Amino acid sequence: MTISFLLRSCLRSAVRSLPKAALIRNTSSMTEGLQPASVVVLPRSLAPAFESFCQGNRGPLPLLGQSEAVKTLPQLSAVSDIRTICPQLQKYKFGTCTGILTSLEEHSEQLKEMVTFIIDCSFSIEEALEQAGIPRRDLTGPSHAGAYKTTVPCATIAGFCCPLVVTMRPIPKDKLERLLQATHAIRGQQGQPIHIGDPGLLGIEALSKPDYGSYVECRPEDVPVFWPSPLTSLEAVISCKAPLAFASPPGCMVMVPKDTASSASCLTPEMVPEVHAISKDPLHYSIVSAPAAQKVRELESTIAVDPGNRGIGHLLLKDELLQAALSLSHARSVLVTTGFPTHFNHEPPEETDGPPGAIALAAFLQALGKETAMVVDQRALNLHMRIVEDAIRQGVLKTPIPILTYQGRSMEDARAFLCKDGDPKSPRFDHLVAIERAGRAADGNYYNARKMNIKHLVDPIDDIFLAAQKIPGISSTGVGDGGNELGMGKVKAAVKKHIRNGDVIACDVEADFAVIAGVSNWGGYALACALYILNSCQVHERYLRRATGPSRRAGEQSWIQALPSVAKEEKMLGILVENQVRSGVSGIVGMEVDGLPFHDVHAEMIRKLVGATTVHM
């Protein structure tokens, strides 16, 4: 009894065997109307769970259908000529592969109580490479292109619990955007990669040692690009430990009718992706739809107004807000800092710019489920604890924020603060954010805009940012409005040239991303809004979860509630006033920030940002 005959029996479809057909690596030239697929055969008792498992992990396991003795797979029954590319199936007993069979005659009785699943294998990376004008690379071995087991877990359903399997192609860095456009044109969202960059971020130790197939060699100018692989089904079969199961071996497929309806439905303009570098060490790129990216750019333009006429337009760098937000979107744990003691003759010396933006960002990070903490000056610890407590009491925050201090004296102290047990391979935080935080100048002092040295009021939190530059996996963002804030070292040349007193006050400490705003609080609000846009974007959201598990957009309602609002920010500023925190420019204890009244200026900015964020994409 041949495999093709059993498929015919199980699926009640006409199946004719091509027993001598060669292994086909590139399916782009297959017979029109047919597409390649892989087969999984499981006991009927496991069928509902496996169907749910595939539906919960659509990226690696796009299920075309299933059939049993009393059911016909619609896609297969529509055609009388279903051809078997490889007349082979792997046999599994209790999760162990016991061999490859070309005849299942001895299992004909068991097959009556089994269900066959057909998994779509039609997306061709080679076709996308060809369309993008990227030459194919030769394999280092005779089999199909390599696939790798990752440490990324698929969504667990009943007894199906396994890692995601991915396939990789090396792509020249300057061809990444073109490749993503080609994959979108061919297959829409289903053709998008789930990781671009360092394989270690997927738990892959060596690209030269694939778990399946042959290695495709990378060149120095290449970036590894990874797609979910249907070979994940083999790991699923192993994990369920069924007493008997069968599955297509790697590289072996059957041909089924093409699913033209689903292919056409996914080709939508709003899904056209952009790719952006968000980290050099480790190398990491993220993707987002073009419309979502444009909305974030609109936020960046909105906050770039210069109400104080300081000349901040000279400090602007394109897409810093977008790249900072993309990096934050991938982070699991974020450390936020704020505090600029410009009023050194008053108690407290802090200003009203900074804490509201920091709290607004922290609130949204919490809504996304990210671990969030704050680090402040020891001198101001009690003040910030009261601010957070009052923010929770008045509904500005839902969850307490751990508040830390740092008074280390060396880079070793800073590394110990950032890393578990001082191990650079185990950072406590993925991303550091400074919002209106006093920044160290080139001479080691800290200056306000009037060139007054306030070093005696500032703890060396800058050292944490400097130490992070040498720890792989930690990124940083600085938000400022005058160039003397922590992180603005990235634009210090422009600060020295264009900002009043810039030659003295310019911060010398650089962040990976420098977000420039007319008022720093606006930068914090804009980061929260940008994170909402990104996580509401189907392209980015799928990339974040590696195309496994359910969509995270189910939390969208709680995200809306976590966005800044005029009501919440009015309460937040009121809390600062109650604690005698003063406006930065005027020194007034009142409802203003940087000398600008809340209701006339800041409330309008919040409305603009949130309105642009929540409008339909």
UniProtKB/Swiss-Prot annotation:
GO molecular function, one term: D-glutamate cyclase activity
Gene Ontology CC entries for this record: mitochondrial matrix; mitochondrion
N6-acetyllysine, modified sites: K93
Main location: mitochondrion
Subcellular location: Mitochondrion matrix
Highest taxon listed in the record's lineage: Eukaryota
UniProt keyword annotation of Repeat present: no
Disruption phenotype: Accumulation of D-glutamate in heart. Mice develop normally and do not display any visible phenotype under normal conditions.
UniProt keywords, alphabetically: Acetylation, Lyase, Mitochondrion, Transit peptide
UniProt entry tagged with the keyword Lyase: yes
Biological process annotations from GO: glutamate metabolic process
Record-listed E.C. numbers: 4.2.1.48
InterPro entries: D-Glu_cyclase, D-Glu_cyclase_mito, GLUCM_C, Putative_hydro-lyase
Catalytic function, reaction form: D-glutamate = 5-oxo-D-proline + H2O
Pfam families named in the record: D-Glu_cyclase, GLUCM-like_C
Presequence range in chain numbering: 1-26
Function of the protein: D-glutamate cyclase that converts D-glutamate to 5-oxo-D-proline.
Family according to the record: Belongs to the D-glutamate cyclase family.
Protein name, UniProt field: D-glutamate cyclase, mitochondrial
Lineage of source species: Eukaryota, Metazoa, Chordata, Craniata, Vertebrata
